[in-house]
């Protein structure tokens, strides 16, 4: 065993071995993998080996596409047969909403180049003659999909890694990990290995590995069962006749998958009541472990399978597998850098580990070696969770994620387990006013407010649902009167010290506000020149700055700041998120409202746009910042959390005759789209330069060096491939752009809608999207696919609502 290596990968399942393979493939041969038992002996060995390309995420979809393409080439590269059966995958639909989901997904597939076909029930019967098509309204098929032999795949990846110089140490247990000045020391029962990087691919042991370095990795496995039957005469006969294998069948509404296996069938349900396992970790001797089967949990799905595939009832059960599958609260894996640690990487929480292994290894190897991934990895970022993700929280959320694998994934879906958790002081007041809540980063946020006797409950859909009218009312009130929005979930911090200005000037691409009290919108780029973070920065004093960013990215943004911050004490960081609340007042009557609750001067002459003042609202101290995300006159009121209800009550009382009403996140989204305001993770991404995203006025390449400048200049010399535009979508009836909709010209995909909504102030359906630069001209006619229907679209000037910002500046 080596005593020194560039990278130590911990864990020898498909994910870990793929990690090793991709590091070696990119040229790092001095890499090793440590496995406590044998390769695949955790969860990989009992995996059903399915390779679903279906994923509603633009980024995760690219990872899955890469993996499937890679697996097709491994036998030629390594000489190892991976048992890849390209038999296609059919997903059945019994409801209109399910077909809407498939059409939305098909749009995503078009933007990343994945082939998907829509089938009629009769076509399903032709491909899957054992399927009862009663009650079906259609299906989708992935012709390139199928299944693979998980253990064989892992061995092929291991061969590919070894052929490039990587080494694998089996039956070697990691007993400790220590950080050093130069990197890490991994302690094993066979000796120690000094290294620069550590990658945790420990699967069911993820939490134990994390504990060795002080990390609480938000992963707990859940039990998953599948049934293998005896051979069925009809399937055996088909094989003898040389007929093609029927492929993978997924009854999404029945919540199960089925495929052929050795002349019989495999049935894998995602049932209610499946418990988390290994809450305190597997035993030290755990290897090739299965749990006692529990067929009672599966009976509703078994009976559903009897109906959909009557042949399933005609054969006996050969074997029931009940093994651990890793889960996270949202069901997506955790791939990327650990927070607060240098060169410690996480590749954990893979509930679809065989599918994800290839893509996760590919992108994480890029991240480690090149410093950044190519694909925006926000959907799988380890830093998308915070300290609120405790073990008890994970247990509830992970069990929820498991049972929801096959539910319809609506764009406005808000899952209920382990909520409410983090609440602003005004939560109960908002609730009494009709708030229907969602959550981000554990925080409860009002999505909208129920009106006119509407049930105080969400109504999920891919189309305009019951909340559409409520949001319309909120938007119009903001336009005509004044609205109140709770944004306490914002991430907030203070950067101070004698070198605070120098540090921040290097961190962001915009110039910092020069005068005390002034505010600038600033963007932090990554080292490849893509947009990493967006901050509202207010100068508090000569050497102190207040930063605000999206609440969902609190850990990500704050970790990014700390990564670049000097450790010599000349710059200090203070997280203010949990101590500072934020209420936003916006609308033409906002100034009158503020004059009623405060004695300070709110005139345009003495309180200009993009400035702030320390004021009092009632008896409470408030940092009033004249900025908002909806394009109206307004202020963000930042205040010590303990004063929030006092401020809230003062505002509501004073605003009665002004028409003051609360509004929610969905109204805010409609209002921001009309202004062409951009969001990190959609319009702003590491995949796009700030120039492509229309941030030209916020980028100052001549101000001096900043993170990403060199790469950005090279990118500009090379030429940009995209341009963000605002479009009006025509002939809309009941569905607006949701994001990831393909944009067409002359039948060819020329772009991707990043987001959209109905703009109630404009009475137009609006989309934001990336298109080829040569098409990004006002008046250009294009088409957008919305739930399978083509709609004409016209490119508008940026910020179609109040393009000169007269209202903001009034």
Which residue ranges define each predicted feature?
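Central beta-strand plus flanking loop segment that forms part of the substrate or channel wall
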Residues: 48-53, 88-91, 214-241, 300, ...
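C-terminal catalytic lobe of FAD-dependent flavoproteins
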Residues: 150, 253, 262, 284-421
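Glycine/proline-enriched, intrinsically flexible loops and inter-domain linkers
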Residues: 375-376, 382-810
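Beta1/beta-strand and adjacent pyrophosphate-binding region of the FAD-binding site
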Residues: 2-15, 32
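Flavin-dependent oxidoreductases
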Residues: 18, 177-292, 300-308, 393-414, ...
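Glycine-rich FAD pyrophosphate-binding loop
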Residues: 24-44
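Flavin (FAD/FMN) cofactor-binding and adjacent substrate-gating region
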Residues: 70-73, 85, 94-170, 175-182, ...
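Dinucleotide-binding Rossmann-like beta1-alpha1 core, especially the glycine-rich loop
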Residues: 49-127, 246, 253-258, 262-266, ...
